[in-house]
Amino acid sequence: MKKIVLLAMGMVLSGTALAQDELETTVKADAVSSYIWRGQDLGNVALQPTLAVGYRGLSLTAWGSVGLANTTDTKEFDLTLSYTIGGLNIGITDYWFNQFAGGDPEGRYFKYDAHATNHVFEANIGYDFGFAALQCYTNFAGNDYKKDGTRAYSSYMEIVVPFKLSAVDWTATVGAVPSSSVQYATNGFAVTNVALKATKDIRITDTFSIPLFAQIAANPCSQKAYLVLGFTLQP
């Protein structure tokens, strides 16, 4: 009996150790000179923290953004549940903003009433081919309506091509909105995001470095362009 108990305890402890080894936790924060998202200007200097846990391709990520230079910038808190297998990934994101036109003027997080919420729910699917990654996103619930009050199902598609040049990691991105959308300020199909980003690790010590990145982003639809500088802090 004693041997059986010891064997059972050993199996439990080994299983727990294995689960701990397979569970991945991410804690990091980006500081950016301006918050540019899919070709849209969403604020000035911002701190953008991330907390994520992952297990065998399944991950839950909390992401936020808060203005540093301008305290009236919109605060954002997003939750994403995603699954990746091979090059395929699918996910659902709950976006929340403390300010939202047509939403809750009091900025309450736990208010989900139709036509009075500051949440937007988005589904995505994508595939990473290695030489390029394709992603498609569509809003399916929350504060996303046409001017006549019907659901808009605002969508966005983008292709990202990574490459390396002069010991620097680069990505080239082209994104488009396929139809009219109040959220993306489009009246039909429109290219809304053309971006080029460079990232290089700045070594601080032998065991610690800070990724520094710069990005040129343009929105052909709104005829605006942006230059963003930022860095990432991650233990």
Where is each model-derived feature located?
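Outer-membrane beta-barrel "beta-signal"
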Residues: 196, 202, 223-235
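Transmembrane beta-strand segments that form the barrel wall of outer-membrane beta-barrel proteins
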Residues: 28-35, 58-68, 90-98, 107, ...
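Outer membrane beta-barrel transmembrane domains
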Residues: 169-204, 213
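Detector for outer-membrane/organellar transmembrane beta-barrel domains
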Residues: 110-181, 234
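Short loop/turn motifs that connect adjacent beta-strands in outer-membrane beta-barrel proteins
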Residues: 19-24, 91, 162-171, 199-212
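Cleavable N-terminal export/targeting peptides
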Residues: 1-24
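Outer-membrane beta-barrel initiation region
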Residues: 20-53
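Residues that define the transmembrane beta-barrel architecture of outer-membrane proteins
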Residues: 23-25, 43-47, 73-77, 117-121, ...
